[in-house]
Design a protein with these regions (language model features):
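Catalytic cores of nucleotide-sugar-dependent glycosyltransferases that transfer UDP/GDP/TDP-activated
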Residues: 1-431
Length: 431
């Protein structure tokens, strides 16, 4: 049976690393594919990947590529690395290969595919949605490595398959010219058990609020994410201001990427100077599991997600998800039967005397609007009139609906189902 080589640039804590952990666990449930090598550029905590049948290969050339590095030298080194590692029947399962984080890896893997090796490009996100990434990809592959971009990113080869997280991205690949039979939708699994709301939650909420130095007499509204730009934190802060009399708004984690740190610190400073009571980094100040069990609602204001765990995991804690809808993500969940009674498609505001969606404004424009909202009562009235759903944002959700969502999520997106989908996908290479 083929070995599976699972690649990602790093194994830092985060969404893709969690999926790789789930991937390994699912294959170990009884799959025929139980000889696994994790291939990565960085792994500070190898313990989760030390399962029987699993080994770890770390090569720092596989990590994110900086603009200062010479891609030609790295290309040569990686050719040697993979030639000594990959066997002819291996399956190279590559996460976010085309994201533009290390275009040299993208080019080397494409070269292996053109030589006949089996490659699965597991696309969580796309460089086409990130102009800086795509420009870096084009510069590295075309100008510095002297290769045509399209045969590197989207080889027209039967031994080069794609997996997407949702049907929207599946159709995106079709429009890019990839045959439908080479694309498989592989939704992420969701781990854990459904938590039933009970009377102990009140005591737990008091404990969490004491640790965060806030009152337990208000609603806890938690955004369980690491704050990066696409999470649209300005909109979260606007909502925190709008509902400050009845709610505490908390966000759990700061960014890791140094490039994301500057705007994040700018928003923290803005909230302090404007006396907007957002609790930043709540996940570092109290136990995350206890926070999720104690919270009243989970909110998302994200503009873009590959799969959208923020729309799924809160339900397992018995918490309704409220906030900004991402139709290309939620439509697959809704088709499975998951119900989202309190999502909005846009937050209309007046900017330069014209209505716009708040998420389309830049950070500085968002801060100007929030400051005006804070100072001008008429602006709050106008905002509510333009977005009547704001009046019912925190309406109570029936326990029956929460339990129905929990059941669907645990059945449809179980580790067992993921294992079946993954094995079926790998078997395509043998046809």
């Amino acid at each position: 049976m083929s070995r599976v080589l699972i690649f990602h640039y790093h194994l830092n804590p985060g969404g893709v690393t969690r999926i790789i952990e789930s991937q390994v666990k699912s294959l170990m449930l009884g799959s025929a594919y139980r000889d696994i090598i994790i291939v990565t550029g960085c792994c500070d905590t190898p313990r989760p990947f030390n399962a029987p049948g699993t080994s770890l290969e770390v090569n720092e050339d596989l990590n994110y590529l900086s603009a200062e590095e010479d891609p030609r030298k790295i290309y040569s080194r990686l050719q040697d690395f993979f030639s000594g590692l990959v066997q002819k029947d291996d399956i190279l399962h590559c996460h976010n290969l085309n994201l533009g984080k290390n275009p040299v890896v993208t080019a080397v893997i494409a070269e292996l595919a053109w030589k006949g090796y089996y490659v699965l490009n597991h696309a969580h996100d796309f460089a086409e949605d990130r102009p800086d990434n795509f420009a870096f990809m084009r510069e590295t592959i075309e100008r510095k490595l002297g290769k045509k971009l399209s045969p590197v990113l989207y080889p027209q080869l039967k031994n080069y398959l794609f997996a997407t997280l949702n049907s929207f991205d599946q159709q995106r690949l079709v429009h890019l010219g990839i045959e439908e039979e080479r694309i498989t939708m592989l939704p992420n699994p969701i781990a854990g058990e459904a938590i039933t709301v009970n009377n102990t939650i009140k005591d737990l909420k008091q404990k969490v609020c004491d640790q965060l130095h806030i009152s337990a007499n208000k609603l806890l509204v938690t955004y369980p994410v690491r704050v990066i730009r696409r999470k649209n934190i300005g909109e979260f802060i606007l909502l925190a201001l709008l509902f400050e009399s009845e709610s505490h708004f908390l966000v759990t984690q700061p960014p890791r990427n140094p490039l994301e740190l500057v705007p994040y610190l700018g928003w923290k400073k803005f909230c302090i100077e404007s006396s907007i009571p957002v609790v930043f980094e709540a996940g570092l100040k109290t136990d995350f599991e206890e926070l999720m069990r104690a919270t009243d609602f989970c909110v998302t204001t994200s503009r873009q997600e590959g799969f959208g765990m923020a729309f799924m995991e809160p339900w397992l804690y018995g918490k309704p998800v409220i906030g900004r809808n991402i139709p290309e993500v939620t439509r697959d969940l809704e088709s499975s039967g998951v119900n989202f009674p309190m999502l909005y498609d846009e937050l209309k505001v007046m900017s330069r005397d014209a209505p716009v969606d708040f998420s389309s404004l830049g950070d500085d424009e968002q801060k100007v609007y929030i400051t005006d909202l804070q100072r001008n009562k008429n602006r709050k009235k106008q905002l509510t009139e333009m977005n009547p759903w704001l009046k019912t944002m925190f309406q109570q959700v029936r326990n029956e609906l929460i339990e129905e969502n929990q059941t669907i999520l645990l059945n449809e997106y179980s580790l067992e189902n993921y294992a079946r989908r993954l094995e079926s996908l790998y078997q395509k290479f043998a046809r």
